[in-house]
Design a protein with these regions (language model features):
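Surface-exposed binding/hinge segments that line
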Residues: 78-80, 185-235, 241-243, 252-254, ...
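Ligand-site clamp/hinge motif
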Residues: 152, 241, 276-332, 463, ...
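Detector for C-terminal structural segments
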Residues: 32-34, 68-69, 259, 265-267, ...
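Extracellular/periplasmic solute-recognition and catalytic clefts
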Residues: 25, 178, 182, 196, ...
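Aromatic-rich, solvent-exposed beta-strand/loop patch
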Residues: 158, 207-229, 247-303, 327-352, ...
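N-terminal lobe/hinge region of extracytoplasmic solute-binding protein
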Residues: 52-73, 83-142, 173, 248-250, ...
Length: 645
């Protein structure tokens, strides 16, 4: 029999529709709260190879589909499956287990999502190529607006059901539902895409509302959830139902709700799925090695350190340069000297995001750009680098620091208190000879800044810098400063955002989010020129021209002074670990803005490392001895020779 190949999937579907007579084999499902669905839901859907079923690979290239059959695992073939790893998740238990909706701007929630769910495809920034995940094949329609994905027929949810095109549709409907309370999500998805179309059981098409070179990546890298749960609820009931629950996922791990608890500051437990559908894929060799991943929560620095050296958990990220250089040394800790605890710094290309002091530009006093500009000359970063940071960090001066997207002529934010005072005087802030504080209209210049316990060591420098020119800064210690920031109930905030290898300025800098809460545009940037440039950036298919556009955006945004830029580490991770682990030669991944196997930052260990039985036994023996020492492993990993570049 001869088939006529046509690039249009619709042509194929209209002529090659084969009735599926069903399967009498019954599946046993785990107990989840589902809606009733017919066991013959897909009985009229064609599962032939031509329409995405098993054997599709034979015809895919003829039909214009793409895939990547040359994915090399970043894991080690020597990795050993089994055992448990325990990390500190955050300072406090997250307010939800959802990663869609309000209160979800959390790196830890992104980790939870990546353990349990999968994206359609994954982008590997090291190779600059897409890699299959839920979708084995993909293609872009001739109109450059329609994107097609073929779900791998082998893909299964953790309860045994098939992953299908219907799941992609249901996930889209959730994302655009305003009831979940996250305007960044529902606005962007509704503005960018029409509702996906189920072409066949395994093939889904998604049409964009405008030509945008970034649309494919936005769709491809989105996580997919099961339709037989989502079809029962809307955005509002999703918030209620899944506040502290997770739907079945297709990923390598599943949350263990029997062990997960909010008691004793909280514990979140994930178990490795022995029935993970892609467990034997060559691209997953050496990955997802731990049977159990525990996340504990500790909100006290001293307790966190004490519990690590007591062996209560396995990986400790050292956040303070002073501690790395003076405290966690062989001279101070016998465990380090004897090799029971290892030091490690990994260099990679994990992208650096914007960070520093940011302002609520909707509120006094930072609704005045001259005041914001003055603050850019008050903060003495050089003193911090020298006195506190041991020159471990590098100052930033861009929304996209150290990348080709950084504008070379961004305004210099140097320490110049005389210039700062001049700008404040011009803005109406004056200080009488007998006064300590600047004042305007009878009101002294006094502001509050929320901070975490222990951060006063850094921010006291700022308190003194501000006091020297007549500004009173009160540090208010709370548990969760980020919540105040994202809700826009702050005056000034120190923090930052995860970097992106490829910029997406829309959510952080477009004015359509300026008046919303729970958005990345927490400083309320609203600049019409930036808006126009963002729109030009999204529709420009020339990479070199896009770089120039982002540089223009960077130049304009930095001159709005919403951020007084801070510092960042030139490496991916610095910390301590119990000496019982094996790891790939690269240590961690290359780097990405999304938490998955290519992440390259904090907690990447749980996907690439493994428990070495021999090392574990030696560690046990050494802990029972006062004199036994273990080999000291390499303290620095620079697999990609970043230091020489």
């Amino acid at each position: 029999m001869h088939f006529i190949v046509n690039k249009s999937i619709y042509f194929i579907l209209s002529f090659l529709f084969i009735i599926n007579c069903g399967n009498n084999n019954q599946k046993v499902y785990k107990q989840f709260d589902t809606i009733d669905i017919s066991t013959t839901q897909f009985s009229q859907e064609d599962e032939s190879a031509w329409n995405g079923g098993p054997g599709f690979e034979v015809y895919a290239e003829q039909l214009g589909w793409e895939t990547n059959n040359n994915v090399v695992s970043i894991g080690s073939p020597d990795a050993i499956k089994g055992d448990t790893i325990t990390l500190v998740g955050e300072t406090i238990m997250p307010p939800t287990f959802r990663n869609i909706g309000k209160e979800t701007r959390s790196q830890f929630l992104a980790i939870m999502e990546a353990l349990a769910y999968q994206q359609l495809v994954v982008f590997n920034y090291e190779t600059s190529k897409y890699e299959p995940e839920l979708a084995s094949h993909w293609r872009i329609g001739q109109d450059s607006l329609t994107y097609f994905f073929r779900i791998d027929p082998r893909a299964k949810w953790s309860d045994g059901r098939d992953v299908t095109a219907h799941d992609v549709v249901a996930t889209y409907r959730l994302r655009v539902d305003k009831g979940h309370g996250d305007p960044t999500t529902y606005k962007s998805w509704d503005e960018d895409f029409y509702e996906p179309v189920v072409e066949t059981k395994y093939i889904v098409s998604i049409k964009a509302k405008k030509k945008d070179w970034g649309n494919f990546g936005g769709i491809a890298k989105s996580y997919v959830y099961p339709s037989y749960y989502l079809n029962k609820i809307d955005g509002t009931t999703f918030l209620e139902k899944y506040q502290y629950e997770m739907m079945p996922g297709s990923g390598p791990y599943i949350i263990d709700m029997n062990l997960t608890t909010q008691d004793n500051n909280g514990l979140v437990v994930f178990s490795r799925r022995k029935d993970f559908w892609a467990i034997d894929e060559p691209s997953n060799i050496g990955l997802y090695n731990f049977d159990v991943i525990n996340f504990i929560f500790i909100d006290d620095d001293n307790q966190e350190i004490e519990r690590f050296f007591n062996g209560d958990y396995d990986i400790y990220s050292v956040s303070r340069a002073q501690w790395w250089n003076e405290r966690f040394t062989a001279e101070e800790y016998p465990q380090i000297k004897r090799g029971l605890t290892q030091r490690l710094k990994v260099f990679n290309f994990k992208p650096t995001g914007v960070s520093g002091l940011s302002f609520n530009t909707k509120e006094w006093p930072f609704d005045d750009i001259e005041v914001r500009k003055a603050f850019s000359h008050i903060w003495n970063l050089d003193k911090l680098m020298d006195k506190l940071f041991f020159n471990e960090y590098v100052a930033t001066n861009s929304y996209w620091p150290w990348s080709k997207y950084e504008h070379s002529d961004n305004p210099l934010q140097d320490y110049n208190p005389d210039k700062a005072l001049q700008l404040l005087n011009e803005a109406g802030w004056q200080k009488n000879p007998d006064d300590k504080w600047l004042s305007k209209n009878g009101k002294i210049f006094e502001i509050d800044m929320y901070t975490y316990t222990g951060w006063d060591r850094i921010h006291n420098f700022l308190v003194n810098d501000l006091e020297s020119i007549g500004i009173k800064l009160n540090l208010v210690v709370i548990q969760n400063t980020f919540e105040k920031y994202i809700q826009k109930t702050f005056t000034m905030h120190y923090g930052g955002w995860t970097g992106r290898p490829i910029p997406d300025p829309d959510q952080m800098l477009h004015s359509k989010y300026a008046d919303d809460i729970d958005v990345t545009n927490a400083t309320s940037m609203a600049n019409k020129t930036i808006d126009s440039l963002i729109e030009a950036y999204e529709t420009n298919w020339n990479l070199d021209e896009r770089v120039q556009i982002i540089q223009q955006i960077d130049s304009i945004a930095t001159r709005e002074y919403h951020y007084i830029f801070g510092w960042a580490a030139p490496y991916g991770w610095r910390g301590l670990y119990q000496n019982r682990f094996g790891m790939p030669e690269r240590g961690l991944s290359y780097g990405s803005n999304r938490y998955h196997k290519h992440w390259g930052g904090w907690a990447n260990h749980i996907l690439l490392w493994w428990s070495d039985p021999e090392k574990k036994e030696l560690l046990r023996q050494a802990r029972q001895s006062d004199t036994m020492s273990l080999p000291i492993d390499r303290e620095l990993i620079d697999y990609w020779n970043k230091l020489s570049k």
